[in-house]
UniProtKB/Swiss-Prot annotation:
Organismal lineage: Bacteria, Pseudomonadati, Pseudomonadota, Gammaproteobacteria, Enterobacterales
Subunit structure: The complex is composed of two ATP-binding proteins (CcmA) and two transmembrane proteins (CcmB).
UniProt-recorded name of the protein: Cytochrome c biogenesis ATP-binding export protein CcmA
Function, as annotated: Part of the ABC transporter complex CcmAB involved in the biogenesis of c-type cytochromes; once thought to export heme, this seems not to be the case, but its exact role is uncertain. Responsible for energy coupling to the transport system.
An example molecular function term from Gene Ontology annotations: ATP hydrolysis activity
Topology of the protein relative to the lipid bilayer: Peripheral membrane protein
Enzyme class: translocase
Primary localization class, coarse: membrane
Cell compartment(s), UniProt: Cell inner membrane
Cellular component annotations (GO), alphabetically ordered: plasma membrane
Domain annotation ABC transporter: ranges: 4-207
Gene: ccmA
Length: 207
C-alpha cells in the first residue's frame, strides 16, 4: 500500500474526456512530474489529488483510506500551491507567513523568506511586489511546512534561474527526508533523471 493511491480516475469537462482509467501509486520519497500537452488535464488532476474537485469516476486514497473519509488529517499533511499564489495581498511578506504558519516564530519566517530570495522585502505589502516576488512569498512556505505531501502547480512561473535551482534543491531535500512532491512545470528540472518519476497524461490514460 502506497502513501497516495489513484484508482481508475475519470475526468470529463465540457463533454470532453481529459483522462480515464488513470491509476498510480506514490510512496514516501517520490518526486513526480505530471506532464502532458496544454488542455490534457494536468491542473485538474492536481485538484483531484488535493480534494478540491471530485472525479467523475474512480477515487483517490491517502494511506489506504478514501480522501472523503480522512479529509481533515489529509489536509494537515498537504501543502497545495496552485496557479494563483494564494496569499493575502494587503499583508506584508512576513505577515503572510505568520498567517499560514502560526506556529512559526519570526526568525523561522525570516529565514524562509531569505531562502526564497526575499531578504530585504519582508515588510513590504505583497501588492507592491512583482509577480515573481509574490510567487516567492507563497513558495517560502516550503521552508516552513511540516506537510508530507506537496502538490505544486507550475511553481517556477516568474522565477529566475537561481530561484528555480534553490526551489529544486528544497524539493530534493524534502523527498530525501521521506516526503512526496507532485508538480507540473514547463521548465526542465536540473536533477538526475533517476530522481524524477514522470506521469504523462494522454486523452485516455496515463503513461
Amino acid at each position: 500500500m502506497g502513501m497516495l493511491e489513484v484508482r481508475e480516475l475519470l475526468c470529463e469537462r465540457d463533454e470532453r474526456t481529459l483522462f480515464s482509467g488513470l491509476s498510480f501509486t506514490l510512496n514516501a520519497g517520490e518526486w513526480v512530474q505530471i506532464t502532458g500537452s496544454n488542455g490534457a488535464g494536468k491542473t485538474m488532476l492536481l485538484r483531484l489529488l488535493t480534494g478540491l474537485s471530485r472525479p467523475d469516476a474512480g477515487e483517490v486514497l491517502w494511506q489506504g483510506q478514501p480522501l472523503h473519509q480522512v479529509r481533515d488529517s489529509y489536509h494537515q499533511n498537504l501543502l497545495w500551491i496552485g496557479h494563483q499564489p494564494g496569499i493575502k495581498t494587503r499583508l506584508t511578506a512576513l505577515e503572510n507567513l505568520h498567517f499560514y504558519h502560526r506556529d512559526g516564530d519570526t526568525a523561522q519566517c525570516l529565514e524562509a523568506l531569505a531562502q526564497a530570495g526575499l531578504a530585504g522585502f519582508e515588510d513590504i505589502p505583497v501588492n507592491q511586489l512583482s509577480a515573481g516576488q509574490q510567487r516567492r512569498v507563497a513558495l517560502a512556505r516550503l521552508w516552513l511546512t511540516r506537510a508530507t505531501l506537496w502538490i505544486l502547480d507550475e511553481p517556477f512561473t516568474a522565477i529566475d534561474v537561481n530561484g528555480v535551482d534553490r526551489l529544486t534543491q528544497r524539493m530534493a531535500q524534502h523527498t530525501e527526508q521521506g516526503g512526496i512532491v507532485i508538480l507540473t512545470t514547463h521548465q526542465p528540472l536540473n536533477v538526475a533523471e533517476s530522481k524524477i518519476r514522470r506521469i504523462s497524461l494522454t486523452q485516455t490514460r496515463a503513461v
